[in-house]
Each structure stands twice: as C-alpha cells, then as structure tokens.
C-alpha cells in the first residue's frame, strides 16, 4: 500500500524532530489504554483493537510495525501502509535487535504506554534509551488541512452527543440513563471505542463536586443537581475532541453562578489569546485570571494539545513557554473549584488562529436546563 500524502508529511516531521534530538532511531508505542493508541495510528494507519503495538522508525529507510505474537488475529493488519509487519513473542527483543548499532534510541510512550517487559528488553541494549514524548507531540502539533477536517468532524460528533445528553436529561432519571443515549449515538457516528465519558456531580444543591466519576446506574438526578458530563471522543479518523456544557433544571447556587460569570469571561480571554505567537504560559495566565480574581482554585489541567492521542504536548500551564502556531488544536477545560468545594467544568476544542482563537463547537457558554434539547 503506498503512503498517503499526509502520512509522508507526518513521517518527515517526526524525522526532523529525531535529527534535532540526535536520535538514530525511534520506537513509537501505542496501547488500547483509552486515548493512547493514537501515535501508532498517526504513523501507520493501523487501529489497535486489543493489546498494543509499536512502530520502529529508523532515521533512514522504511519503518516497521511490530505486534506481540498473541495479537496476530486482532485488528485489520492490512489497513497499514507499512509493509514490514512483525509478530514477535517479545517485541522489545525484536526492537533491541533492530536498533543494534544505534547510540541514541528515542521512545514515544516510555513513561505511560510501553509494555514493561519490552522496556526491560530495550534497556538491555547497548544504546541510550531516551524519552521522546514532548518532541514527538510538538512535531505533530500543527494540523494539516486534512487533519483539521477530521478534527472538525470529531467536534460535530462530540456536539451531537451533548445534544443527545440534553434530550435525555430529566430529573428522576439516573446519571447513566441520561448518558447512555449519547454513548450509543457516538458509536453510531463512528467513534467505536474511542470515548471517555464521565460526570462530575453529587455536589451541594445547585452545584457539582470536582471529582470525575463513572455515571451511576442507580443514583437518580434531582432538579438541583448540577451535571457536568465530561464528553471526550475520537472520531472515525482517530482525532479526538472534547466538548461539553453543564446541565441542571433547577437554580444554580451562588458559587456556581459566580463561577459561570468567570467562565464567560474566560471564554473571551481564550478567544483573544489563543493565537499565533502566544505561549502556553500566556494562555494559562489570561484564561485563569477571571477565576483567580474571584478567589477560585484551579484543579485539573487548564488545557492541552489534542490530536490522535487524547492528551498531547504542549500543556497549557504556568511556566510553559512553548510558542503556539496557527492550526494547533487544544482542548480547554478549566476545572474551577469554589471555597464550598463545588466545581464548574466545561470542555471546548479550540484552533489556534493567526489573529485570534477559533472555538470549534457552536455551543453557548451557559448552564443548559433541558428545554433547549
């Protein structure tokens, strides 16, 4: 199978980052751990169904796709454009042998993705093993036109899921009953298993608590329960999006109402600062200001680059001086916590623009009461 044009571009970008880092070869890890299969899909077109896989990328020559032998009949191995496909009893041993003669071997997924037995095999080699997550992510952070089209498709699917949640919402139902139709809709629209659907709920009247939990199949929702469904999906192409808004039929608490005002201000700040030339620190500073000015705490990370892996570098945070470029894509989701322990949390996917940021969904920044669906 010939390399698609965008695949050639991706490989050139990754090899450029390898040269900059002085690597002789690179191992790219992927597993079925939700959201962490995408680096393999990005480089070779193979969708991991079960277990894990690696792409071996030499600085020169053709890459190889490596599977554990027990995964021989798991997944469509003909979907990749990489010709050399290897099934190894211990993939790390095969990778170590292929990397023989290298001085510096990079590994994407070294800390979170790579199988322990394969790391042990690699570590026994005569080369230096180097973590390469940040460099890999930065090399793929600017999206091509084809990739942006896939991102927009994922956002449309994500937004459709939110409207399905809203249509299903009714006090007296369980959290899971409200979520279930959206999960089905996501699958109908091509997400497969690429979904991370949680909820922040169980808070004081008119509020939600800050912990992410699986929607309960037994807990019935009241009108004063603020529901913050965390809707995160990967579209048919494997590109991820995160879009959600709070839902509650009753009246928000004073703390929730104040956090909502800050969220509206944050959205305008994000639009102004998420542009070419800003740094990740600039974005964090501008976006956190409406919350900090009101004395709120920020819990979960403010935002992060998002692509075919759910969470990519750069992260939006204090002290991160990575400069942003047009057509990078970020998930932004300030995790705002009030003094009474209640929380407000919304997700939005943004494109870095030349002059300002582009919010990719059409959803208003507000608390939806169910009448809109």
Language model: regions and residue ranges:
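Active-site neighborhoods and metal-handling regions in enzymes and metal-associated proteins
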Residues: 1-373
